[in-house]
Regions:
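Glycine-rich, Trp-frequent "lid" loop and neighboring beta-strands that shape
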Residues: 71-72, 115-166
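N-terminal glycine-rich flavin-associated loop
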Residues: 95-115, 140-142, 155
Length: 166
């Protein structure tokens, strides 16, 4: 087996024009809007509500939501760029964005029924903050360690949990 250096010279991993534009836009936001309030928010455990209001003006809160629900989907590289630029300046804001996009919006878009999609996705695309909660006695927030299960009751009217919730 012989490896060719031609392959190395011909492979280019460059950002597209759209990806570069998103990087510059998010970098400008992160460097301008987030720094003045980071220490105060962190010290006082205050969520970045005002900063989020400014962030949604860019329309990036809907990147995991299909267009028919008001979103503006981007590729995975763009999503990574947004997270990278936010986390460079304010990791907690980046986590808030990740939860909104990945754990909330994307989960509903992929696994929600039509009623859930119509109810939640337009609101999330418009800027309402998405959230996610997971806790179990003995497992905390470690999803892999969860043992609690929900089973539909025999009459189909409710679910029965077989463990403890915190």
């Amino acid at each position: 087996l012989k490896c060719s250096n031609d392959l190395d010279r011909n492979m280019r991993f460059e950002e597209t024009d759209e990806q570069q534009m998103i990087r510059e836009m998010v970098r400008d936001f992160a460097e301008t809007v987030l720094p003045p309030t980071i220490e105060h928010r962190d010290a006082n455990q205050i969520p970045p509500a005002e900063e989020w209001k400014q962030f949604i003006e860019y329309g990036l809160q809907g990147i995991a939501i299909p267009e028919e629900y008001g979103g503006n989907p981007v590729d995975d590289i763009c999503e990574s760029i947004i997270i990278e630029e936010l986390a460079r300046i304010d990791p907690s804001f980046a986590v808030m964005f990740c939860v909104h996009v990945g754990l909330c919006s994307k989960t509903i878009a992929l696994h929600g029924n039509e009623e859930q999609k119509q109810n939640y996705l337009p609101r999330l695309a418009a800027g309402e903050v998405g959230a996610y909660s997971l806790s179990e006695a003995g497992a905390g927030t470690d999803a892999a360690a969860m043992v609690c299960k929900a089973k539909l009751s025999d009459d189909g009217s409710h679910y029965i949990l077989n463990g403890e919730k915190m």
